[in-house]
Amino acid sequence: MMSQQLIDFIDSRTRHPYKSDEVEKFQQEVNELQLPDPNSLPILSEEEKRQAREDAAFRRSSEGLEDAWLDSAIPADPTPIFRDTVELLCVYQSFVKKSASLDTVANFLDFSTDFSTLSTKKDETEIAPDCLHYIAELLFQKKEREVKEKWKNELTEKLKTLFNWPAINPNLKESSKFESFFGFVRSIQSFKDSETGLPLFMQVYITPYVNQFRYHFMSQKQTNVLSKPEWFFEFLLKVFRSNRSFYMLMRDIKFFPGVPPFFTFINLLNNVAKEKLTHIIKYDDYLVHLVHETLQYSVRLEQHFHYTQDPLIIFLFEQNGTYDKWLGLETQLSLTKLEDIKIASDAWELESDQSDDFSSAVPTKMTVRFRDMIETTFSVLQNLPSLDYQFNFWRSVQLKPMMQYVNWLEAFYESHESSSSIHLPGSLQTDKSKFDIAEVERMCKLYSNFKLLMDWLDDIEDEDVYIRIGHKMGSENYAAFYQVKPRLSTLTNGSFRMILRAVSQTLRPLLDNYSDLDTWVIKEQLPGAALLSTSVSAEIVGFQSRLKEIIALLQKLLIGSSQCEAIYQIGTLVESWMIKIVMTHQFSVRGGVQFAMDAMQIVLEFSDYPLLKFERLMSTVELLSLESGENKLIKKLIIEINQKNYDFIDEFFKTKEITLSYEDALGVLYRRVDAWKD
């Protein structure tokens, strides 16, 4: 039979359950129970347990009923002693006794284990009062709070004493004296703060930094400036830099599976930063700058600390409507800057200070400004956290204004392609008295815009981010700008041809005046008179002067291969014009010599370009200026060529360095009047 003390305890707590403020009473009463050894009690069968449950239920249902009608002569059955009930009460008693001595982590772990056992253990006879588990849980919670508060105080004191926390010394070298502290941290690493749910150590450790953050950036302090997110990001980075060495000493402690403790520290402070971000994103005026600084912060975390977990930019973009609003603001900002670039009064002026950055032409100011505008967005593009974000940003903020810019330039190209009389805006409205040379300048500047854009795109397309974007679009060779580059290539080649056309339209009238001379056939001078004139023809001076001016202009506006190609093309054009003059006129010896002097004067203007040899022109004037002499050399050469006596001709050509074909040489020789005179 069960002892009267046990019966009274069970009976009392069945009828009067413990209340939430009776934890100490529970401890006292359970401690005072005199419990028999459970092993001395019989093991009940399932049928006996069922019967016990029914009896207990009956007794509970009878509580408070009037029993006068019951037959008092029938004695009550004795209360049996049940092993299940006693075993459960033994666990409660052990649990209560341990709650009095929780001075070590091991003791608390043992205490916690007993509570876990209580949580799963039940009295199958259902005799033990139901309130026991409830009040035991309250006891556990109370003791847990007390112990954790004690540990937090201990952590705080040791951190201050050993590490001068929170002003942690970043150059910790002697780690052996800290082993005891880290052993303590390791022993409680699985325990969470009751209020925040954070690991107990981390809750203690981050508290002063969180308080500093809130004080400076979430209060009425002057450091709380919405337009300066870089201030609180720099504060966080400074905190991380000063604490990194400390966390290296405890890198084997894991508060969360797979997460180094230093990253846990960063995560927790980033959570505070998220509160700040959600406040700033309400203001459109600050959103673009906020995103840029958040991206830069994430980059610096990765560069300095190899941290890639939970980027704040993802949190920012996932706030309702924030990403779309930011992208719209970035797009509008780029288009506004583009309009400012186009309408600037100095847009078409040369940016000579930037010429070293380009290999084909001296850029206009608007080209440099447009390039700089796009390049300032590159770091944002590169640092965005996913390809989808990057693609959308590139399409809206880079490609869209680029297409508009090219369309705008193409309109000028089409106007000039159909008529060379249409002026470009800004500084290109030059003096009409110099319209001819100004047209060359305009075409060079138009060409430089197309060419430099083309070269610049070739350079930046090798960046990984553009390769990934090109791959996403499925473009050939993964070229991100495949939509615009073919157009730029066509416009570049076309505007280069327009430079040559403008040069031709400027020079050709002057050379036509020269070719209209009727003095090529001049009577031979008297015997003994000087054959050669001492100066070039007056009529060639205007052509030479304008040619010199054009070459100087091209040297000013074009660079490298573009400059060489343009001047080579002009040299070839001039050579063909001069040869055409020869082939459409007749020359005396004196006229041929004069033409040769004029031609040499023109060739000298190209002396900076040794690859331009003018071999056809030089060979032509060499034959054209031959003296007849007594041997009738001109006629002899004609006869030898006609008779195909090429040995003599080859030897003569070699001596004079003539490279013309026999047919072309014959044509030049016939231009001499003495070739057909007796």
UniProtKB/Swiss-Prot annotation:
Pfam families according to UniProt: RINT1_TIP1
Domain RINT1/TIP20: 99-678
GO cellular component terms, semicolon-separated: cytosol; Dsl1/NZR complex; endoplasmic reticulum membrane; nucleus
Compartments where found: Endoplasmic reticulum membrane
PROSITE patterns registered for this protein in UniProt: RINT1_TIP20
Origin: domain of life: Eukaryota
Membrane keyword on record: yes
A GO biological-process term: retrograde vesicle-mediated transport, Golgi to endoplasmic reticulum
Membrane topology: Peripheral membrane protein
Keywords (A to Z) from UniProt: Endoplasmic reticulum, ER-Golgi transport, Membrane, Protein transport, Transport
PANTHER family linked: RAD50-INTERACTING PROTEIN 1, RAD50-INTERACTING PROTEIN 1 RINT-1
Subunit comment: Component of a peripheral membrane protein complex consisting of dsl1, sec39/dsl3 and tip20. Bound to a SNARE complex consisting of ufe1, use1, sec20 and sec22 or ykt6 through direct interaction of tip20 with sec20. Interacts with dsl1, sec39/dsl3 and the cytoplasmic domain of sec20.
Known role: Required for protein transport between the Golgi and the endoplasmic reticulum. May contribute to tethering of coatomer-coated retrograde transport vesicles to the ER membrane through interaction with and stabilization of the SNARE complex.
UniProt-recorded name of the protein: Protein transport protein tip20
Organism, as annotated: Schizosaccharomyces pombe (strain 972 / ATCC 24843)
Gene field: tip20
